[in-house]
Amino acid sequence: MTIFMRLTPLPAFLIAMTWLAPGFAQVPEAPQTAGAPAASEQTPPDVLQLQGRTLRTYEVPEANQGVAAGLTHFFAVDNATLAKYEIKSGRLVDRWSGAPNGPIRHMNSCMVDTGRIRCANSNYPQTPMGSSIEEFDPVSLEHVSSYSFGMRDEGSLTWFDRYRTGWITAFSHYDKNGGVPFKDHSFSSVVTFDQQWRRTGGWLLPESALERMAPYASSGGAIGPDGWLYLLGHDRPELYVVGRPTMGPVLVHIATIAIEAEGQAFSWAKNGQRVIYTIDRRKHLVRTIEIPPVVVKDASVRRFR
């Protein structure tokens, strides 16, 4: 005997629920944004291991925090002291010194820029952290102007450089002396500003570089002639090279360069060569070091210039 059953059509909402049930969901593939890397290209590139070459060494008693290079002179930085040396002869030309424990008490770094020596100053190791930019005349070493950040949640200003039409900077936190108990060195970051020092963006430091800087953070930094950002920690003889991510808030670590220097502020030569001026703070030396090319072909990382 054959049995016939009458099938009643399912209501439309039940059909919709069937398609949306687990195992039946039909999710269209997200369109690829023009210029964005494919998923396979979003994995960070391998970190290159490179070696710098020392070219020249200067004996500089003031080489304690860093050095800034001009065309004919370099300027050694030591907290509240700025010393001017002739590049060709290594001769001391002049020295500026602030009052002990005065308003300029901890210059972390300086840069020679548009007829000025611009220096990152902080109240380290005092807390709350306060920072300012102090400017000097490169000829007379006379102090000419000051810009105060006051207290910022980002931490203590350690270095800054030109970036697009504004600035790129580092604000640091510390695990020990000079830090605060609720923020360790991992809260350090790179921050961008416009010409009037209004914040425009920023990034976290990559863990692979940050762990090498602990318990401090980035004490020196500058964009190189190749457009990558180069960073020095507090004491390791290593230069960390990072790029901008195409997505996300963390810088991309692309290379580590072994150099004969132990951290802190450095400066690129003004002649456009791949040479940096850096210091050995324990021996009170300034060294010029040739930096090898950093070649990275990866769609997930971009240069700063």
Regions found by a protein language model. Give the residues of each.
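Beta-propeller blade signature
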Residues: 130-140, 184-197, 241-244, 291-294
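Residue-level detector of Asp-centered blade-edge/turn motifs that repeat once per structural unit
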Residues: 69-71, 112-114, 162-165, 223-226, ...
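Blade-loop segments of beta-propeller domains
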Residues: 91-128
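A short helix->beta-strand "capping" segment at the edge of beta-propeller domains
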Residues: 37-61
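Surface loop/turn motifs at the tips and blade-to-blade linkers of beta-strand repeat domains
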Residues: 55-61, 97-102, 147-153, 203-214, ...
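Short, conserved, GDST-rich strand-edge loop motifs in beta-rich repeat architectures
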Residues: 120-130, 170-187, 288-291
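Conserved blade-ending motifs and adjacent loop-strand segments that build the rim/top face
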Residues: 249-270
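Beta-strand-rich domains and repeat architectures in extracellular enzymes and scaffolds
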Residues: 54-80, 106-108
